[in-house]
Amino acid sequence: MKSRLPLPPPSALLPSFKGGLHDRRTATAIGRLLGVAMLVCMVTGVLSHYLQHPPSWLADDLPARPSWGYRLNQGLHVGVGIAAIPLLFGKLWTVYPKLFAWPALKSARHALERLSVAVLVAGAVFELLTGLLNTVQWYPWPFSFVPVHFAVGWLLTGALLLHLAVKWPDIKAYWWRRSAATRALPAEPENTPDRRSLLTGLAVAVGAVTVTTVGQSLTPLKDLDLLAPRHPDHGPLGLPVNRTAAAAGTTRVDTAAWRLTVRGPRPYELTLDELAALPQYEVELPIACVEGWSKNAHWTGVRIKDLTERAGAPGAALRVVSLEQHGAYRVMDMGRSYARDPLTLLALRLNGQVLTPDHGYPARIIAPNRPGVLQTKWVTRLEVR
């Protein structure tokens, strides 16, 4: 009878990791930068969500100023999110040997740490990947992007807080490098990059992806946005377009038959010529889209507050209805804070020219501090609420 050879212990089957680039100090150095990036993305993401989908109790009190607020918010959200991608790769590369640690679970605290790491990694990869694909408007999944992205963001925040609580002793020890023990790095094998090279490489990667994408919202760098899906100058009348008239089914608007219908205590209708004969105002406001691109433009049109006042409801909240028959935003609610703001227009002209079909001809909404999807195009009706 043949004797069987004894199986090696699990630890003997695990890979051996050497060098100073998988140590706690390096992980903490990268982790604090990634943590700040995630915090910025979470805060700006929540602000963006509630500006785009406000609860009923908040809708009338959303701030219309500063007029560039949403542009800054969404530029930070997308720009920092893209910059976080190389940081996440660097963090995962530094800590991945921990995945092979044995025994897999040592204690209840260790189990919590493992659970938080699993959710944290999965959530971070999901948020950054889906967010990046959203910037190019590619959605190769069966679910709705906005609610799922928002929900996973909260899940990721919870996992991050749990992870920080579990790892707080290490963070406290290595963040400020208080002792010789925490300042010391493990010996590094020959011909391997050192910690400084790793951090320098990450800094270069973050700088490169930022400089080549942030120009879609930061005008001085617009000619360097080689990797951005939008250039702020490319589009009809010098302004990009997300949803075209062809996609909305509004390429052929019968100008002679078109009417602006305003419903309120004193309802009325206006032809395009009658609307153009009303006092016109010019404002400079940005279009800022959730995908991250934005640009200032000059808009000319009639103040919304003048139209609601004529209907007997000055400064009232509105429901704006588009000629578009299909689309998530063909009907848009506008709270009182926007409707009574003097910068909010029913615009007829863009940069001195009559609106093109892609920009919402014959009339569109433009309002300060408001997501681009809520700047309704091809407007046909205003309903006082």
Label every model-predicted segment.
Residues 1-232, 249, 262, 361:
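Membrane-embedded alpha-helical bundles that constitute the cytochrome b-like, heme-associated redox core
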Residues 214-385:
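Structured, non-membrane catalytic/scaffold regions adjacent to prosthetic-group chemistry
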